[in-house]
């Protein structure tokens, strides 16, 4: 085809026809690519199987939940293909979850440099590797600075609340909104970042608790220098530029600074754009989640499936099954979660079984900050979850006092900028709600009081107007602007 080919100027191809052609491409690749375990060289059969499994899970669940397509009767076919492609890879016993002796394997996986084999990593199926000479990138700088030269990143409370406690139960184990029964392991929001304690071990390998990781990192020698630097508490800022100076670049919009992907290598930050942090494109951990979800959607999942998928991921993360046996997920011991169930009941137009709820939770937690959440919500027809209020940490009196320290005083030279926080009113840098939780982006005209807008038209991207001008046979997706109006 070339730009004048008539095939490019006809009406839209039906979704079913397009998808069948995509499947033919996958099957051709699987049949013709080499069957080896080279994760960063030529594309191989395992990579094609992985992509087929991921694609078929997307298409199967999209067809199941998007009833407007009238394709629900074909959803199972795609879920079965997703399941089977994943199982083919699993049966080769070629890939295994990355583990280490220090208990931080989940964090360590995402700060590797060089080929996965050199790092003792058998989890990565496809990686993008950089040498820093001919090929590099600037992500180490963005993660190291927490994107402080643009709008800063930050973890919201609604995200934190989805992480279980270390006993395998959520933070609220009974009751209803306004009268929840609290898990005894959950320390609540009234302390100094203590809500991160006693939780799924991946939480503190994703979000930095002051006193750990970036908050005590000495950029001069790439060591954790608590004695020299003290704890560098996160600066809370919304504005571009983030202020100056910003020692250790420890800024955030919510009070919770991300630590996943952050690597303690200042030289690599400054090597921009020649950073060498490995990019894991396909990994075995995601494949296990795909398999578990496909099996659950088909109504086939067993305790054995849970052990080789969800429970394997939890064990790698650091869950102590000997201390908390119920942290091991089984079909007969699925924890209650009144908070999440209430959100699903309010935001979704279908019910979610307890086991699917837990698998979706596991997927969100395990793949946090890997760019999958948006597409997951699209295929689950769960866009209204975007309207769950986004809030930052609770500004307790202790934190308000901490953030009011005068940085001109040598005693507090490494503390955050002075911040005054009249509860419920505009402070010097922080605005909080009636309960004292930070409202991110308080001047935004689209995110109002932490609530993001949603419109169902966003389940489908708009067709660019210039494409419709070139091809009048194309029709705009529902809800988006057409060339005729």
PLM regions with names:
Residues 3-14, 263-273:
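Acidic/His metal-coordination segments adjacent to aromatic residues that form catalytic metal sites
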Residues 193-316, 467-485:
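C-terminal substrate/ligand-recognition segments
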Residues 19, 46, 56-240, 385-415:
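An aromatic- and glycine-enriched ligand-binding surface/loop that stacks and positions planar moieties
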